[in-house]
Amino acid sequence: RERRAPMPLAEGRVRCRTPLGARDGIAARNLLGAILNEGGLARDAIGRIQVRDSFSLVELPEDGLERLLGKLKDTRVGGKQLKLRRYRED
């Protein structure tokens, strides 16, 4: 399957990755709800959410990212740990 180039990021946002994806029964709304509820962000602070088969990508504000990831450290979605990390494209 052909790899798609990621969409360009809006200024001030970074892409984060979770190992949860469609195979885990995860939908974008599940990730959105968890990040809004546990992270305390406003809806407009969260950018594009891309759910792939075996992982998902979420665009989040770069400012305060480490604090946000700390808040989400123990968050579970669909009974599985979110494990959200900053995504570095190689």
Language-model features and meaning:
Residues 3-90:
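Terminal-proximal interaction/regulatory segments of ATP-powered molecular machines
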